[in-house]
């Protein structure tokens, strides 16, 4: 069984190496501040670094994620803040010769609607025109088994449109707790974007002893969260000794607006 698993992994590596020669040049996130009724343009440059031509297609997808690590890339629309219907792409299919580049143009047509507010987003997904099909012959105890695998490598470019400076900015602290993983101790902070604009920030945890004296600030990872989505942050507090503490959790990245919460800590091991 171990040999079979290793053979499958090796097969996947061989079959995907070809399309892996296609790369996206430039930023993978395109942000636009827009007005209702406006038209905005952009270009995605695809490069074929291989020695064979590759056929590609560009598809519009909607994208959502949550704090549990679930990601949804699905045909639009799957949420009310999708801008996929506003976007046109040319070409949507093409063949890229070896060693050459392809310019994919897109236009964003913002609807003339007064009720547009906040952030809207979607994904332009670059993938092979047909899934790569690879076959291999696996041998085990004088038995032969032919397996066919379909493998798809995708490159995603996010298209974000903000309607001016409109829309509310608001987050919700869903859960805070101490967790242990990989021999270290963390404060896990789950945050949901309940506003109308995308946000990017990192939580900062300041811990106080029973006398109210600060014993240090501990930064978590940074993340971007779209409206209705959520993310999980971890702040390493392994160096904090056993004891009871109070923690103040605040978020940066919101200018003069600060979001925060408090929690009690009981570190026992």
Per-region residue spans from a language model:
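Sec-dependent N-terminal signal peptides
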Residues: 4-18
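Beta-sheet-dominated interaction scaffolds and their linkers
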Residues: 20-54, 93, 170-182
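Short, solvent-exposed loop/turn segments enriched in Ser/Thr/Gly
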Residues: 26, 37-43, 102-104, 115-123, ...
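Short edge beta-strand/loop segments characteristic of extracellular beta-sandwich folds
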Residues: 43-47, 186-194, 236
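Extracellular Ig-like/FN3 beta-sandwich strand-entry sites
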Residues: 39, 53, 101, 117-119, ...
């Amino acid at each position: 069984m171990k040999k079979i698993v290793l053979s499958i992994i090796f097969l996947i590596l061989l079959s995907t190496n070809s399309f892996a020669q296609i790369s996206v040049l430039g930023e993978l996130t395109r942000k636009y501040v827009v007005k209702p009724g406006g038209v905005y343009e952009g270009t995605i440059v695809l490069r074929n670094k291989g020695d064979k031509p590759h056929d590609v297609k560009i598809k519009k997808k909607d994208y959502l994620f949550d704090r549990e690590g679930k990601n949804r890339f699905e045909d639009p629309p799957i949420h009310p803040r999708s801008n996929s219907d506003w976007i046109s792409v040319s070409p949507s299919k093409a063949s890229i010769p070896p060693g050459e580049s392809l310019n994919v143009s897109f236009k964003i047509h913002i609807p003339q609607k007064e009720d547009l507010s906040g952030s809207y987003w979607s994904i332009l997904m670059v993938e092979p025109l047909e899934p790569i099909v690879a076959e291999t012959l696996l041998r085990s105890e004088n038995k032969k088994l032919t397996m066919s695998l379909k493998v798809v490598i995708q490159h995603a470019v996010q298209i974000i449109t903000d309607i001016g400076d409109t829309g509310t900015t608001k987050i919700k602290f869903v859960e805070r707790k101490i967790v242990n993983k990989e021999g270290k101790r963390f404060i896990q902070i789950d945050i949901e974007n309940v506003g109308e604009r995308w946000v990017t920030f990192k939580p900062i945890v300041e811990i106080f002893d029973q006398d109210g004296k600060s014993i240090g600030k501990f930064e978590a990872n940074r993340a971007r969260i779209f409206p209705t989505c959520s993310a999980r942050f971890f702040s390493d507090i392994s160096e904090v000794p056993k004891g009871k503490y109070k923690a103040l959790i605040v978020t940066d990245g919101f200018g003069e607006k600060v979001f925060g919460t408090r929690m009690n800590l009981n570190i026992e091991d």
